[in-house]
From Swiss-Prot:
Cellular localization per UniProt: Cytoplasm
Phosphoserine found at: 244, 286
Entry keyword annotation includes Phosphoprotein: yes
Protein name in UniProt: Topoisomerase I damage affected protein 11
Cysteines paired by S-S bonds: none
Gene, per the UniProt record: TDA11
């Protein structure tokens, strides 16, 4: 036993009071002088007598019963259904802990009692029976005091428990908020890292694209170099290339005659070169492929010649018809002059006769010369005619043509005139080839108004000797009008 228990027992001995139990509801019976024993209440689980042995060895009986706990339901602190209840807060403390702390809750009160006051004390009957309390000195706790003390204690305990709960919840809430803030910061850092990674990947992709374009350019240049080494014709200029069968079969005379018309072969050869380069770029070039291609080109020369000869001949014939109609429409002063047809129509008749002679000689020339040569000549003649007739006529050589047309029709026949013109062209061909002039080539000139007036002036100067002055006057009147 400790000192506290010894102190309580000594006080109990002095006061003859048992304070071992405490209940919020106390059943009191009228105090009797006779100290008879407490009657049995075995149904409630209480012992009849509780004897204590003092230090002297004498036994004395306690006036209050000491409960013995049989089970949780028979505990004396268990609330009875018909007893008054004191509102208390149910704490989370277990029952054994409450039983161990019951001694600290004892608040003994010493109240002196007298016989008069004992008679005035109300008799409070317990639901199970009345118990006898001695008169000498007893601890009387009224129900109001017990209830007040019982209410005071739970209130204090509840306030303490609430404060303890608040103290415990605040740190937990603080921990939760800090954890949330920490998780928020980590998420923000993760997002920043992801954004930085995305930017790095974008920069890397741009760098890789630039490398890809640079390598593709280098590969293209290497392909061109390899194709140039394997195919020497690509290194030569366009004029000297021999892989074009059409350009190879064109005679040298036609090439020199049309030196000024270099735009057409260049424009024709550019698509071929582009197509050839595209084929070289699209697939790897090998010497076997080049040889096979050349063999196919050589074998297809005859088919190409027959393919292009008929359309070009038809096109040349159509061009002659158009030129004849234009010359006839430009000869507008035939109806106004009223002179004989022989004198007025000498220039046009010469051109018509030359056209007929060319038509008559063209089939023979085509039969004599190779088919490819005729096709090339007709093509270059058509180009020259278009250039001379539609783009303008070079008038610096008009005097030579006028003298030829002025002298030949009067004194020579048409056949001799054509022979003289052909000899004149042959003598001047070398000069035309060197200078690139198209005036002395085999090209037909359109009869414009100015040239026709000059021809008429020349014819009038010849016919004035025979006394024909009226024609010159009429022509001047027509021109002035």
């Amino acid at each position: 036993m400790n000192k506290f228990d010894e102190f309580i027992e000594s006080n109990e001995k002095d006061l003859d009071v048992d304070t071992s139990t405490r209940n919020s509801i106390i059943s009191m019976s009228p105090v009797r002088k006779t100290g008879r024993k407490i009657r049995s209440a075995s149904s409630n689980g209480y012992r009849l007598e509780h004897h204590r042995t003092s230090s002297a060895g004498s036994m004395h009986s306690q006036r209050l019963m000491t409960p013995t706990r049989l089970n949780d339901q028979d505990h004396p602190l268990q609330a009875k259904p018909d007893a008054r209840r004191v509102v208390t807060r149910h704490s989370s403390v277990s029952v054994p802990n409450a039983m161990s702390k019951r001694r600290s809750l004892i608040q003994p009160m010493v109240v002196p009692t007298t016989p008069e006051s004992q008679n005035n004390l109300p008799s409070v009957s317990h639901s199970e029976g009345s118990y006898g309390i001695p008169l000498e000195s007893t601890t009387v706790l009224s129900s109001e005091q017990a209830m007040a003390s019982g209410l005071r204690r739970p209130r204090n305990g509840s306030s303490q428990s609430v404060n303890s709960m608040i103290a415990t919840t605040i740190p937990t809430n603080g921990v939760d908020v800090s954890a949330l803030l920490q998780s928020l910061a980590t998420k923000e850092l993760e997002l920043l890292e992801c954004k930085q990674k995305i930017e790095d990947l974008k920069k890397q992709t741009q760098h890789e694209e630039q490398n890809y374009t640079r390598r593709a350019r280098e590969l293209h240049e290497l392909k061109e170099q390899v194709s140039k080494h394997l195919d020497p014709s690509l290194n030569t200029p366009v004029k000297n290339r021999a892989f074009s069968p059409v350009y190879q079969n064109i005679p040298l005379e036609s090439r020199t005659e049309n030196a000024g018309n270099s735009s057409l072969p260049s424009s024709v050869s550019k698509p071929k070169n582009m197509g050839h380069q595209s084929t070289n770029q699209s697939r790897s070039v090998s010497p076997q492929d080049i040889q096979e291609r050349r063999q196919r080109d050589d074998s297809s020369d005859s088919s190409k010649q027959s393919l292009w000869s008929k359309p070009l001949a038809l096109f040349n014939q159509f061009d002659k018809i158009i030129q004849h109609e234009i010359e006839r429409t430009l000869n507008w002063d035939d109806s106004l002059s009223g002179t004989p047809e022989v004198q007025e129509g000498t220039p046009t008749s010469n051109s018509e006769s030359s056209a007929q002679q060319y038509d008559n000689e063209a089939p023979g020339a085509r039969q004599k010369s190779p088919s490819q040569g005729s096709v090339s000549r007709s093509l270059w003649s058509f180009v020259s005619d278009v250039k001379a007739g539609l783009l303008g006529i070079e008038e610096e050589n008009d005097n030579d043509v006028i003298t030829d047309n002025r002298c030949d029709p009067v004194y020579k026949s048409d056949r001799q005139h054509e022979q003289k013109k052909s000899t004149h062209k042959i003598t001047n061909r070398g000069q035309a080839e060197d200078s690139g002039d198209d005036s002395s080539l085999n090209m037909r000139k359109f009869k414009t108004t100015t040239k026709f007036q000059k021809d008429n002036a020349g014819n009038n100067s010849l016919t004035d000797e025979s006394g024909h002055r009226t024609r010159e006057k009429k022509v001047k009147e027509v021109v002035t009008s």
